[in-house]
Amino acid sequence: MVSLKDSHFDLFHLPAQFALDETALDAAYRTVQTQVHPDRFAAAGDAQKRIAMQWATRANEAYRTLRDPLKRASYLLSLRGVDIGAENNTAMEPAFLMQQMEWREGIEDAAAARNVDALDALLAELRDEKRVRVERLGTLLDSGADQAAAEAVRQLMFIERVASEVGAQIERLET
């Protein structure tokens, strides 16, 4: 029997690795939700309702974490005792720092020129960069290169933030 303290992977009976069968995750999530959905406990006592709600909440949180590659990577690292240090470790390789500056300049220039096409192109570039880096992250995690994976997670977090900023600029210019 799985307990509330078990890992997200244990909850869904999946191996604790980055490479994930999304179809199996979806099916396992539906199975767990069917078992613990609060509606099944409508006639139960308050204690059973509360426990069902805890399990449903836990299943939702676990599913959201495992479904998102960046959250899944961060979670895997935390299970291995590796702190990604996103709040206090901003050191990154020089090539990535240069890329960051180029992206920032691209955002500023395109926003100043009110050039939505340039922002769309930058957003596409960021999505491609994220896809490539997520693949690399999976290789790092599944080979046990946890410190390199932690840096890759920090870089991906930055890329997601920049992509979000680009999306906000596009929305601002289109309204």
Curated annotation (Swiss-Prot):
Q: What is this protein called?
A: Co-chaperone protein HscB homolog
Task: Output the SUPFAM superfamilies linked to this UniProt entry.
Answer: Chaperone J-domain, HSC20 (HSCB), C-terminal oligomerisation domain
What Pfam families does the entry give?
HSCB_C
GO biological process annotations for this chain's record?
Answer: [2Fe-2S] cluster assembly; protein complex oligomerization; protein folding
- Organism of origin is Burkholderia cenocepacia (strain ATCC BAA-245 / DSM 16553 / LMG 16656 / NCTC 13227 / J2315 / CF5610)
Keywords in alphabetical order: Chaperone
Its biological purpose is as follows: Co-chaperone involved in the maturation of iron-sulfur cluster-containing proteins. Seems to help targeting proteins to be folded toward HscA.
Spell out the subunit comment. Interacts with HscA and stimulates its ATPase activity.
The UniProt entry, under InterPro entries, shows:
DnaJ_domain (IPR001623), HscB (IPR004640), HscB_C_sf (IPR036386), HscB_oligo_C (IPR009073), J_dom_sf (IPR036869)
GO MF annotation terms: ATPase activator activity; protein-folding chaperone binding
Q: Which family does it belong to?
A: Belongs to the HscB family.
Q: Which SMART domains match?
A: DnaJ
Lineage here is: Bacteria, Pseudomonadati, Pseudomonadota, Betaproteobacteria, Burkholderiales
Q: Give a yes or no for keyword Chaperone in this entry.
A: yes
- Residues covered by the J domain: 7-79
NCBIfam families assigned to the protein according to its UniProt record, in alphabetical order: hscB, PRK03578.1
Question: Can you cite an annotated GO cellular component?
Answer: iron-sulfur cluster transfer complex
Question: This protein's superkingdom?
Answer: Bacteria
